[in-house]
């Protein structure tokens, strides 16, 4: 991403910051929206549209999902720094989140849940690690706007 000293089209910041803000907004909506509904989906009876597991198992799965998100930030940062670069990794993470949500919506039962949660979890963690790098790359280190962008 090119450094843009004179680009001030988004509240005094480069226009690319608007895109990143939107990506981050929808990723957080995805994460917290799923956190709020996931346990109900797992422990509601099959006849009610759920999977019919116990509340204890549902809580364990939700906790493991949350842990996966934050643990995968380490892997995502490594992939971004060493293999693909920040922008490609960010794009790949967004695609993983999308595929995870599609899996949760379209693949029935525990298989769809497992595939979907792994894809969304790894994608969300990777996206969290990479977004900050992309924001930092938009500014020169001496740019006064850099701190405000974060």
Please provide the spans of the model-predicted regions.
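Intracellular juxtamembrane helix-capping segments at the cytosolic ends
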Residues: 126-140
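Loop-to-transmembrane helix entry/capping segments in MFS-fold secondary transporters
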Residues: 17, 55-56, 141-150
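Short amphipathic helix-loop junctions that connect adjacent transmembrane helices
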Residues: 36-59
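Hydrophobic core of transmembrane alpha-helices in multi-pass small-molecule transporters
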Residues: 25, 100, 111-127
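C-terminal ends and interior cores of transmembrane alpha-helices
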Residues: 92-113
């Amino acid at each position: 991403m090119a450094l843009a000293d004179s680009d001030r089209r988004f509240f005094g910041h480069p226009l690319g910051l608007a895109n990143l803000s939107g990506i981050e907004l929808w990723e957080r909506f995805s994460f917290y929206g799923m956190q709020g509904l996931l346990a109900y989906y797992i422990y509601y009876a099959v006849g009610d549209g759920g999977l019919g597991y116990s509340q204890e198992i549902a809580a364990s799965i939700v906790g493991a999902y949350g842990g996966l998100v934050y643990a995968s930030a380490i892997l995502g940062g490594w992939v971004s720094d060493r293999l693909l670069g920040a922008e490609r990794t960010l794009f790949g993470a967004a695609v993983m989140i999308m595929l995870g949500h599609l899996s949760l919506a379209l693949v029935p039962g525990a298989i769809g849940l497992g595939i979907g949660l792994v894809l969304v979890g790894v994608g969300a963690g990777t996206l969290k690690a990479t977004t900050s790098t992309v924001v930092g790359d938009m500014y020169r280190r001496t740019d006064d706007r850099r701190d405000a962008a974060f």
